[in-house]
């Protein structure tokens, strides 16, 4: 039986997308179109690199309207800057059309607040979504933004935004370190983490090491902080690690994974490795922090001053956080694996194809 032809339109093909697309390719004849390729893994689907033209902040994909005619389904990221993608719902078509995204406009200016006031661009975004045969959101919570609007939520599916992990077991004796994983830039609140860690040492003489995995603009500032505060041997910088097996070793040694002001894909990654994630309740997110049930499988805190107390408590009561880690792992296995993400998307594709 021939598979239906599916084209997924992205800005960038990232490494974390590959495993879910490989899973989707088992059900559909999948092509992924993009204008930037950051993938390194084996791709069991077709790839298509687009020619683009940029005019200011806007992107136009060359010959896109001709390309899409050869597919049964087309699924695009509804980024309003990519004019060619967002024009698709308003053109005559024979193929079924879907969108796949956070679910509403989120940025540093518009954080993940489902109760915020709608503005003109939200109306434009809604028009784009409403003209599609189905929508795929990263998290169930995003539907709340569209309550009491004309968007048909019966045509909205959820594919929990997540990332893959490798099996590492759960050895309580190894789990002692505090861990940060991600790009080192100011938006992550690394300065707040370092300050809280220093305060925790001053308060309780904790001996848990802080391991930082990543690279970026804050790298030299972190080195300077470590030197100025005599934290050599306590704060360990590893640089960027792209090998998942090597990264997994750091999670295997971690009691907590912490990112004060941003909670993205590191949240399900950490949970998948059985490590509670710690971040502010107001952290910048694509919705991933809503995987966390505060105090059960992770920690959400409100004030910066609380973080040092959390680190001290983890040092003094590690069993409490080990139990959280086990619950985090169970949550990931039950709700947030790559297979859950793929099944959510496939359900949307099947629905669109048959309605």
Where would I find each of the regions flagged by the language model?
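Donor nucleotide-sugar binding/catalytic pocket of nucleotide-sugar-dependent glycosyltransferases
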Residues: 125-169
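Nucleotide-sugar donor phosphate/pyrophosphate-binding loop at the beta->alpha transition
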Residues: 105-127, 165
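Short hydrophobic beta-strand element within catalytic cores of glycosyltransferases
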Residues: 276-284
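Acidic donor-binding loop of glycosyltransferase active sites
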Residues: 249-262, 275-276
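A conserved mid-protein helix/loop that constitutes part of the nucleotide-sugar donor-binding site
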Residues: 19, 176, 183-201, 217-223
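A charged, aromatic-enriched C-terminal amphipathic alpha-helix characteristic of glycosyltransferases
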Residues: 316-350
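Nucleotide-activated donor-binding/catalytic signature segment of Leloir-type glycosyltransferases, i.e.
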Residues: 221-241, 295
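Conserved acidic donor-binding segment of nucleotide-sugar-dependent glycosyltransferases
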Residues: 240, 280, 294-305, 312-319
């Amino acid at each position: 039986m021939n598979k239906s032809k599916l084209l997924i339109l992205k800005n960038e093909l990232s490494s974390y997308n590959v495993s879910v697309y490989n899973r989707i390719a088992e059900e559909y004849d999948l092509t992924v179109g993009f204008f930037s390729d950051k993938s390194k893994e084996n791709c069991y689907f077709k790839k298509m690199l687009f020619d683009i033209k940029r005019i200011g902040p806007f992107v136009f994909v060359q010959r896109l309207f001709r390309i899409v005619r050869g597919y049964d389904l087309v699924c695009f990221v509804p980024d309003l800057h990519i004019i060619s993608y967002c024009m698709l719902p308003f053109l005559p078509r024979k193929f079924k059309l879907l969108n796949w995204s956070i679910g509403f406009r989120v940025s540093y200016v518009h954080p993940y607040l489902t109760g915020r006031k709608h503005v003109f661009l939200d109306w434009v975004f809604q028009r784009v979504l409403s003209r599609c045969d189905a929508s795929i959101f990263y998290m169930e919570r995003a539907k709340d933004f569209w309550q009491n609007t004309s968007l048909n939520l019966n045509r909205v599916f959820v594919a929990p935004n997540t990332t893959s992990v490798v099996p590492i077991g759960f050895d309580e004796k190894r789990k002692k370190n505090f861990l940060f994983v991600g790009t080192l830039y100011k938006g992550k609140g690394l300065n707040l983490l370092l300050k809280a860690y220093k305060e925790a040492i001053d308060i309780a003489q904790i001996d848990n090491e802080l391991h930082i995995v990543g690279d970026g603009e804050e790298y030299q500032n972190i080195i300077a902080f470590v030197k100025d505060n005599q934290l050599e041997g306590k704060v360990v910088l590893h640089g960027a690690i792209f090998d998942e097996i090597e990264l997994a070793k750091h999670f295997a040694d971690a009691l907590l994974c912490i990112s004060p002001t941003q909670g993205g894909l590191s949240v399900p990654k950490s949970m998948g490795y059985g490590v509670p994630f710690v971040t502010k309740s107001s952290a910048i997110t694509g919705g991933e922090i809503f995987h966390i049930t505060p105090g059960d499988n992770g920690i959400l805190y409100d004030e910066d001053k609380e973080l040092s107390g959390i680190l001290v408590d983890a040092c003094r009561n590690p069993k409490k956080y080990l139990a959280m880690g086990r619950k985090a792992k169970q949550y990931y296995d039950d709700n947030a694996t790559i297979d859950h993400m793929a099944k959510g998307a496939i359900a949307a594709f099947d629905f669109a194809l048959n309605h």
